Design a protein with these regions (language model features):
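Soluble "head" domains of membrane/secretory-pathway proteins
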Residues: 2-7, 23, 27, 32-33, ...
Length: 234
């Protein structure tokens, strides 16, 4: 016991710093590494995004117990949630809020009877953000099979990545989002395990919102920093 007390006295400043950092990251803000391309082109593999854990709730440190509701997710928010279905922390975009009636056919969303509008900004996406074929992984998707479109999400414009030739997995019939749930999709519409696979997202699983990156490291290029993606608004 004396040894423990002595260790604490010797390192109390360091221990206090560690405790404060743990509390801060569990209740106020955190950094989330994005390992997949399900949110391309908005978020790419290797991005470290800032998670605002006070966006919707005040949470008890370490336990993720919600003490006070501050707000609810809005359509278009990029949310971070702990999915019990996939047993993983996921990052997706909210496209349906409670009360919405949503369907998707041929990668075109219809929300409350309004078919969303899409426009093409660039003829070809930036190849640095795309999966390209390689001898090590021949199943990766080639550049000319995907295109990026601007999606008007009922007033919020953002980019989505879709398969040029369509995909049956992008289709679902009308779904009414019940109270306490959200419908979330990846911006990379044909390569995302989202509400089409794991179902609607319970409000209680949502832990925060992201609006910008902190930094980005390129996993395909020896983790070289992508300076143009530092502090990038999403």
């Amino acid at each position: 016991m004396k040894a423990i007390i002595s260790l604490f006295k010797t390192n109390k400043d360091l221990l206090l710093f560690i405790i404060l950092m743990v509390v801060f990251r569990s209740s106020f803000a955190d950094i989330n590494r994005v390992p997949t391309g399900s949110m391309q082109p908005t978020i790419v593999e290797g991005d470290r995004i800032v998670v605002n854990k006070l966006a919707y709730d005040v949470q008890l440190p370490l336990l993720q117990t919600k003490l006070l509701k501050l707000d609810d997710p809005k359509r278009g928010d990029i949310i971070i949630f702990e999915s019990r279905v996939s047993n993983n922390r996921l990052v997706k975009r909210v496209v349906g809020i409670p009360g919405d009636i949503i369907s998707m056919h041929g990668n075109q969303l219809t929300i409350n009877g309004t078919s969303l509008k899409y426009s093409q900004e660039h003829s070809n996406p930036d190849s640095s953000d795309l999966d390209t074929p390689s001898s090590a992984n021949p199943d990766r998707i080639s550049l000319d099979q995907y295109t990026d479109l601007n999606e008007d999400l009922l007033g919020l414009n953002h980019q989505v990545r879709i398969h040029r030739f369509g995909s049956s997995s992008a289709n679902f019939n009308s779904v009414t989002v019940p109270k306490g749930y959200y419908l979330a999709l990846g911006d990379n519409r044909d390569r995302s395990a989202d509400s089409r696979m794991i179902g609607l997202i319970p409000r209680k699983e949502i832990i925060g919102r992201s609006q910008r990156t902190l930094m980005s490291l390129d996993p395909e290029n020896y983790y070289v920093p992508r300076l143009d993606r530092f502090f990038k608004v999403l």
